[in-house]
Amino acid sequence: MSNALYLMLDIKKRLTNIKTCDTLSSTNQYMEVSIMKKVKIGSIIVKILEVFHWVGTVLMAAATVCSMAAPQWVGYFVGFDAKECCGANLTVYGFEVTAPVTNGNADMTTFFLFGIGATVILGLMAMVFRNLSLIFKRSENNTPFQKDNVRMMKEIGIFSIAVPVVGFVMSVIARIVIGAEAAEISINQSGIFMGIIVLCLTQFFAYGTELEKDVDGLL
């Protein structure tokens, strides 16, 4: 009788352990699926932003060229809703230039300088979102601690810092060429801070990559 009781208790304990393991396994699978869905959604959003920025880069480059080839058409389009007293306010990611407006047409020299800076800035931001998209894609079915991901994160930090620097340089050039009223010399500190933070995170990713390499070597 005693042996039968012990046997029943042992069977019950084993069944409980199996049930617990199944529950933990189901929980882990649910968490993995949830993480994968979030990574997939993030990848789609970043890809859309990348495409928008590449389109913006191409359009801005075309408008910059047209400002010299067909200045009257571009000048009317830019100064369509602007007042002569205030000028046309042109801005992108902290880089801001005010183009004088005369008879409804914006000054094309100002727009040309703005277009050069805006094209470079939009191209840099497109590269930021491109790298983010690749990082998401590489991490869908693999660990994020990869050598290529570390390199791309470092590039993101550099591009983020380069955006306000380009805006600052073009603002200085605009003031020299056009005048002090055309552009305000300032630098977008948020872009620099974001770039520095990303570069710091890159060091953690590099350390994680080395640790994962050591673990794989032990296995």
Q: What do the PLM-derived regions correspond to, one by one?
A:
Residues 71-92, 118-123, 155-158, 214-218:
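Alpha-helical transmembrane segments of integral membrane proteins, especially early/N-terminal helices
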